Amino acid sequence: MIILSLYIYLGKGIAYGYFAESLLFIGLILLVKERRKIDVINSRSAKILYLLLVVNLLYIFRGTLEFSFLDTLRDGFIFNYVIFSFLLLLFIDDIQKFVQSIFYIYKYYAFILFILYILSLNGFIGSISLFGNIHLLFFKFGDISVHLFISFIFQISGLNKYKKPLDLVNLILIFLMFSVASSYSRGGMLSFILAFIVFYKYSRSVIIKQRLKQYFKYLPFVLIFSVLFLSTFKVNQNFQGRAVGVDQVANNFTSIFTTTDDGALNDNKIWRLLWWGKIIDYTFNGPYFAMGKGLGLSLADDDEILTTDLEGELRSPHNFNLTILARYGVFIFFIWIYWVVRQLKRLRDKSLSNLNLILICIQIAFLFNASFDVFLEGPMGAFPFWVFVGLDLIFEFYGYYNAKQELAIFEQTTQ
């Protein structure tokens, strides 16, 4: 849980410490060792993931024949991180305690994030690096928006409870940091909004909707506080020419649907669209239809994409789905899309429970942000995402949804 917390709080700042990969390797050994005591999840969703893991192993072998082993293995983690979903079987006897630990990680996420963000603005503290050349407090604001949504959804669903006035303080910090994140990331902003809309639309809980109405009373105060913060708190522009502010948030939102006067926003959108179009062309209409380009090569170099290197080496097209298409080809791409559709179509199930809805909406936030950024290709996004997927698989396979296990989780939440 400590390692998971570090990836949630710090993200890319510890990505090159390879803690997640080491944990995955150790967990896999333990899973093999305890295999006789564990029931294999054989739901259709799980079987699709097993298939992707097997295919990925073959692609890794194929890639090492032509490219360096380390580059191939690194690219192969796009699906290797799926293993985290099944490592949760090691905690099957204490799954409720495991879930409670995740709630606790997010209970004070907004507060800790706010402190870390303020510290990152200090020249000395903000420049500290422990792993590679990435600053320890290097924030990817799309990732932050996803975690803020999780913190928010845990609060309004009652999974995390707060004494007054901490409930209001937490809401203020969530939306304050969401405003900051929205200044830098359009994808993250939309991930939060879209996932919340889906949650509200499909929630059948009268209690949750009543709690939301109570929180809406504070909305004007929260908005005023956020606007004042954005208006008075001045931060230098980032490498994309974006700075914290109300105008920047507005420009980011309008640039999604229209062409703005901000050249950086337009350029950032154009190079993505051009790259995505090239991938679709050489797979669906080109020589990489069946097998893709494989693992081990840099897609940016091979596709002749010219961008700045201010975020480090660029290997993937800022879209998880199209990364799969480019590297694995059309067949694996459609298998992946089929898995995603299976996850989402459960929203229409009449037996949809509160926890099931929450876990699906969390997956929506992750997947949407991953459609505009390099997120699930690395441990900072993939580790927590596949943990949530694993919880979903376990609760569905063992029949814990709408059962005493789910009821106990909601009853055991404390202030």
Which residue ranges define each predicted feature?
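N-terminal signal-anchor transmembrane segment
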Residues: 1-36, 54-66, 78, 116-119
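Transmembrane alpha-helices of multi-pass inner-membrane enzymes
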Residues: 25-28, 153, 358-415
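Membrane-interface helix-loop-helix junctions at transmembrane boundaries of multi-pass membrane enzymes
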Residues: 32-47, 157-170, 207-216, 341-360
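Alpha-helical transmembrane segments of multi-pass inner-membrane proteins
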Residues: 99-126, 138-206
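A membrane-periplasm/extracellular boundary helix in multi-pass inner-membrane enzymes
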Residues: 182, 203-262, 281-285, 295
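Long extracytoplasmic/lumenal interhelical loops at the membrane interface
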Residues: 262-328
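Hydrophobic transmembrane alpha-helices and their immediate junctions
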Residues: 305-308, 327-366, 401
